[in-house]
Amino acid sequence: MPELPEVENVKNTLNRLVGGKTIKEVNVLWSNIIKHPELDEFKIRLSGQTIQHVERRGKFLKIFLDDDVLVSHLRMEGKYALNQKEEPIDKHTHVLFEFTDGSELRYRDVRKFGTMHLYPIGEEEQQPPLSKLGYEPFSAELTPAFLKKMFSKTGRSVKAVLLDQSLIAGLGNIYVDEILFASGIHPEQKASGLSLHRLKRLQENMVSILKESVEKGGSTIRSYVNSEGRSGNFQLELFVYGKKGEPCKKCGREIARIVVAGRGTHFCSSCQK
């Protein structure tokens, strides 16, 4: 699933590709993707509106138009690409936004898990799914002291807490494993037991790793590409994620894989305590 760095790169490429384009017509080939409003209203409201800009919130895209905001979640395999109307339509393309200049923004999703919600500007943050999201990882409010207070309310592992989108929005399996490795924290460690010193390292590594990944285009583990069709490069920098059985780059011990919070989890038993 695309995480914060990947969605940030999709956001940046969409701004370059479709900012300022006016929607002529919307064609939906798989209606289950449209969660709000009803399909006919979704298509009618979007027609005639111009894309102003695109933002990111957690793992969601917020496509701002004249009057509405299209909230899009890519889930496992969702992708956007700009095509010309006359180009063949891939069988996994499910939503097409035709623009007045003859180009089309196409949403492709092999798994069909992606979602789209349309709300009037200003209402999107008060409605699901955005209303359920926690703090952005880059938020100045996420100080070590604030994290200590947040984590003290739970008996869960630090990995489970970092994956909880209602607390911190945008992290997923890849970056939680990498952040915990960089911080020397075992993924099964109780979040409530972490000291301020360890939380400071965690917060600093969270910010630095996410920023570096954004700069390097995100991580292409399986099929991720941005909206210009480019793969990411941060997968080349990973220390533990997907490295089961390989020697740790820091100490040489074999990287282990366990299941934490229902997710496959990679870590070094020597470097992480």
Residues covered by each model-derived region:
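Structured catalytic/nucleic-acid-binding cores of DNA maintenance enzymes
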Residues: 1-273
